[in-house]
């Protein structure tokens, strides 16, 4: 065996072996327990970053561990390859999105292979290929036939100069990224999928996701946002019109002093016809890109409509205001305002001098609304017949009264909105709907699927090529002229079902149910927590749609979810002559000075610029602190990068990139290599004979088997890969100090090395593969079994007992593991150090903690 560890050489050889033998290609095997391990697939941006490497290393560790447990392990990979970045890159590089995307896929595929990930490449998918999206289109038409798809107008960002729709990312400071024209809001028809039809099931089934992080489950519960309340009808004074309001706090109904409606509400539109100030306000609101998230921080503004609402119980008239904090697409577009008991309503009322009435008081103590609203639940007062009721009592009595009088109804509402899947972009899957000459809209017939996106296009940066090309939209359906839909799907569509397509990627149907039901659900899913409320919710929703279409037979797509933390790196900049910050890569920092706590106090780059150190932050292009994985692999080898990624931090927490830590990981692998090299060079013919072992040899063997037990639990159950690595490192310290003099010495080292290379195989597979062969094994490590703990090796022949005299440690004695108290006392009392402290005193009491402590009290 080579004495020196040469990563580039062994990694190339091992990767060639995996490729030639198709090691990780799997098929369904009913006689083996399956394990489906999946990491969220990458967008082919051009190069892998360290966040990818962490995600995929975790997945590979889990997959390889499960393989050595004897399971039939599927670990596929593919490309989430539609999306806006490809359009922008195509414009900048004067090419089309397709060649840019396919070129990136090839480059990144090579990077993944260099890192040694054990993927079944025969199942590779790219979502931008017709072979993939044809089934997405087919499924959409089936959802339409089921009544789960509909079209309605919805607001988009509109550039009036270019006459085009802009993605949110293309709006910069309220203006078009390209021509700097102020962006307007425009209502256009768009397609929606009724995720709200599954809101209750999506919410209830969160309770079945035992293997998902609580944080993700809480985020999804809040996003779905179930609430119980009352929908009630307010009349409009002086007319026969009325409008509905939903509230979760009917107990505050008697404190309503005004009503706020959205600028787009029909009543506001009517009032604006004779109110120029209101008309201007409505136009301003229409052209703002306010999202629900921004409402909390924006300035609350409004205009009185001149209309009055009639209170459904008292009949009192209260003014109706148009307000910028009410959204037409959320709820009914109108809210009852109770400034005494809602802080937003309170601030608005103060600003516009509207009355504030208190109708709820605390059960104990005084009520004070001079500075802020009282928002807690309490006891009703100033509420007529409802005085003295608490929240629950008032909710029921007021709801019952409104229902009895035909002015309201109890209602369960969800914060969740239906999923708008239309995008006015080019690089996405065409939506398979057509409009006939008579205006009828129907799905594209199945025999005309897929609706293929043309790839040979020119991007002008203004309009989607399939919108600009009037000929592309023209088609025929059943002999009639028709026009294709020119919108494309939201790219979350592709990532909502890719996990299922991996089960049968070549199937001439959406899924092969037999194969899908063998592999699904995913046993371990890995990805960032930033996907909690979008991808991970659509992922769950789509699985239920697939179930109801008879394609899968389970309720949820993934049993376990691991959300890995971000990768951080040092960030440095200097200010140039123009006063702009120039961010410098950590790799270009020539010298640093640190304080006694190891914090960087001074840094200079290769060009001599004195740098400002801003601390550790997420690797990003904007701060130029990303570390190219390929550079690290070329310098240290893939196994070193993988080992550092697993050792530096628990998987859910952020990982701080430190090249000193990478160097430490590299040194550890070299130590392992050296130990194996020394062992292989000796005569190792003597087999292990447990009956011949000395106490020292038994102690070393005990450490080996304790480590096997710990690493098995750390990787398999706890998923604490960092502590698993630490345990092996600790064992290596023992092994390096151990003698290799006798045949039994070497037999224990041999047993230990056999275990260590398998324990580390999921993390450093190239080194483990090579050392396994060098240790004389005839089978491949991939076909071996995970090491098993020898329980008898864990049994200790002796125990170390601490002896105290009057609470102070005076000696440590070794006793037989099964020694009784009398034997331990006799040995303890006979110890020379203990005798010294018992001279001239009387022993009053002896306390024995079995296997640990002998405490002598004397005076």
From Swiss-Prot:
Cleavable signal peptide: none
EC class (word): ligase
Catalyzed reactions: tRNA(Leu) + L-leucine + ATP = L-leucyl-tRNA(Leu) + AMP + diphosphate
SUPFAM superfamilies with a match to the protein in the record: Anticodon-binding domain of a subclass of class I aminoacyl-tRNA synthetases, Nucleotidylyl transferase, ValRS/IleRS/LeuRS editing domain
Ligase is among the record's keywords: yes
Residue window of motif 'HIGH' region: 42-52
Protein name as it appears in the record: Leucine--tRNA ligase
Organism of provenance: Shewanella oneidensis (strain ATCC 700550 / JCM 31522 / CIP 106686 / LMG 19005 / NCIMB 14063 / MR-1)
Gene that encodes it: leuS
């Amino acid at each position: 065996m080579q004495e020196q560890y040469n990563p580039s050489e062994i990694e190339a050889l091992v990767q060639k072996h995996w490729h030639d033998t198709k090691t990780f290609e799997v098929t369904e095997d009913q006689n083996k327990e399956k394990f489906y391990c999946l990491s969220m697939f990458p967008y082919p941006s051009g190069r892998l970053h360290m966040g990818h490497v962490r995600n995929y290393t975790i997945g590979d560790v889990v997959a390889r561990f499960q393989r050595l447990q004897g399971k039939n392990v599927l670990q596929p990979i593919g490309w989430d390859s539609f999306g806006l970045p490809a359009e922008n890159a195509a414009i900048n590089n004067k090419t089309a999105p397709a060649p840019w995307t396919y070129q990136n896929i090839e480059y990144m595929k090579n990077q993944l292979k260099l890192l040694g990930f054990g993927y079944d490449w025969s199942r590779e998918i790219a979502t931008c290929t017709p072979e993939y999206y044809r089934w997405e289109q087919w499924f959409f038409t089936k959802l339409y036939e089921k009544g789960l798809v509909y079209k309605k107008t919805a607001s988009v960002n509109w550039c009036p100069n270019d006459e085009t729709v802009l993605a949110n990312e293309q709006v910069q400071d309220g203006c078009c990224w390209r021509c700097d024209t102020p962006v307007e809001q425009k209502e256009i028809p768009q397609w929606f999928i009724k995720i709200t039809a599954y809101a209750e099931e999506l919410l209830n089934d969160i309770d079945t996701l035992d293997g998902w992080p609580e944080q993700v489950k809480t985020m999804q519960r809040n996003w779905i946002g179930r609430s119980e309340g009352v929908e009630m009808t307010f009349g409009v004074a002086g007319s026969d019109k009325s409008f509905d309001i939903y509230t979760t706090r009917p107990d505050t109904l008697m404190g309503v002093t005004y009503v706020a409606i959205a600028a787009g509400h029909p009543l506001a539109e009517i009032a604006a016809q004779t109110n120029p100030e209101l008309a201007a306000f409505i136009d301003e609101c229409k052209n703002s890109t306010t999202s629900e998230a921004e409402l909390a921080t924006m300035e609350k503004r409004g205009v009185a409509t001149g209309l009055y609402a009639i209170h459904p119980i008292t009949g009192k008239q209260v003014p109706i205001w148009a307000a910028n904090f009410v959204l037409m697409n959320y709820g009914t577009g109108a809210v009852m305002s109770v400034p005494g008991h809602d802080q937003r309503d309170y601030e608005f009322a103060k600003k516009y001098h509207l009355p504030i009435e208190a109708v709820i008081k605390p059960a104990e103590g005084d009520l004070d609304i001079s500075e802020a609203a009282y928002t807690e639940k309490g006891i009703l007062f100033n509420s007529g017949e409802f005085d003295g009721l608490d929240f629950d009592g008032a909710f029921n009595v007021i709801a019952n009264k409104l229902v009895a009088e035909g002015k309201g109804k109890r209602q369960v509402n969800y914060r969740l909105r239906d999923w708008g899947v239309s995008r006015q972009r080019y690089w996405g899957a065409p939506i398979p709907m057509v409009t006939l000459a008579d205006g009828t809209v129907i799905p594209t017939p199945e025999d005309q699927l897929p609706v293929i996106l043309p790839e040979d296009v020119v991007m002008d940066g203004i309009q989607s090529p399939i919108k600009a090309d009037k000929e592309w939209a023209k088609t025929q359906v059943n002999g009639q002229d028709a026009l294709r839909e020119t919108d494309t799907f939201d790219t979350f569509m592709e990532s909502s079902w890719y996990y299922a397509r991996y089960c049968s990627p070549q199937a001439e149907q959406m899924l092969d149910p037999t194969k899908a039901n063998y592999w699904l659900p995913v046993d371990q899913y890995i990805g960032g927590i930033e996907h909690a409320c979008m991808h991970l919710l659509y992922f769950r929703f789509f699985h239920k749609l697939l179930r109801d279409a008879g394609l899968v037979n389970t309720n949820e797509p993934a049993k376990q979810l691991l959300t890995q933390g971000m990768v951080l790196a040092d960030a440095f900049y200097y200010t140039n002559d123009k006063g702009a910050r120039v961010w410098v890569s950590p790799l270009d920092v020539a010298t640093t000075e640190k304080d006694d706590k190891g914090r960087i106090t001074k840094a200079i780059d290769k060009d001599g610029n004195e740098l400002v150190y801003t601390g550790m932050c997420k690797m990003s292009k904007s701060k130029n602190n990303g570390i190219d994985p390929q550079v690290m692999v070329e310098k240290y080898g893939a196994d070193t990068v993988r080992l550092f990624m697993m050792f530096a931090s628990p998987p859910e927490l952020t990982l701080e990139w430190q090249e000193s830590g990478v160097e430490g990981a590299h040194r550890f692998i070299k130590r392992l290599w050296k130990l194996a090299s020394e062992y292989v060079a000796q005569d190792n013919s003597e087999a292990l004979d447990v009956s011949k072992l000395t106490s020292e040899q038994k102690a070393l063997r005990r450490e080996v088997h304790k480590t096997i037990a710990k690493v098995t639990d750390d990787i398999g159950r706890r998923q604490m890969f960092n502590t698993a690595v630490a345990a092996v490192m600790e064992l290596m310290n023992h092994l390096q100090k151990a003698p290799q003099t006798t045949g039994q010495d070497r037999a224990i080292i041999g047993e230990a090395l056999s275990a260590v290379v398998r324990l580390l195989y999921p993390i450093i597979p190239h080194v483990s593969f090579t050392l396994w062969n060098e240790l004389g094994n005839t089978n491949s490590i991939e076909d071996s079994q995970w090491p098993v703990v020898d329980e008898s090796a864990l049994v200790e022949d002796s125990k170390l007992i601490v002896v105290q005299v009057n609470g102070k440690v005076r000696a440590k004695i070794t006793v037989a593991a099964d020694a009784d108290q009398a034997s331990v006392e006799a040995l303890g009392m006979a110890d020379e150090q203990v005798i010294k402290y018992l001279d001239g005193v009387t022993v009053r009491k002896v306390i024995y903690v079995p296997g640990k402590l002998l405490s002598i009290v004397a005076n």
